[in-house]
Amino acid sequence: MGLGFLRLALPLLMVAASAPAVAIPRLDLSGYPAPKQGLKRWVIQPSGLLPKSDDALISPHPLDWRVQLIVGKEVEMDCNVKRLSGPSLSMQRLPQASGKALFEVSGPVLVLSTRMACNSEQAKGKSFLSLGKQPYLIPYNASWPVVVDLPDGVELRWRVWKAETRQQEAVRL
């Protein structure tokens, strides 16, 4: 190795050594059964290091947070009203996986649409349609992955809900 190599390598090593070490957690899916035929596995690994909120009304405690699972499809939109129809998300506790759960939609998810004649000049676009009207919320837990099996062609999206710190009184009747 020549002196030129050291001149090039030394600054790179110093930069790498000064960067904070970040451990990348391994995704442990032991204890989960294989997806049933026709289903695809989707996995969410919530981070234990979410950015802190500047809003004092938002709880900083993960015990007050929830993960919303959003099952849906990206569909071509036109002048017709479209929505998804299919079985709702179900949860199955896994005894061999100590407290972990498997979520699943176990049937076909269909796009229902009105059948109006659309103007050919009208703009078309894609939109994500979600299955079901009510949010499907589960406790936030950075220790376990969220495992969801869905029919082919269906996607999973998610977001975190955080509770307010203040509690409000109800009216007693």
From Swiss-Prot:
The keyword Signal applies. One of its GO terms (molecular function) is serine-type endopeptidase inhibitor activity. Residues 1-23 form the signal peptide. Keywords: Signal. Gene3D superfamilies: Ecotin. The keyword Signal applies. Transmembrane segments: none annotated. Belongs to the protease inhibitor I11 (ecotin) family. This is Putative ecotin-like protein. The lineage of its organism: Bacteria, Bacillati, Cyanobacteriota, Cyanophyceae, Synechococcales.
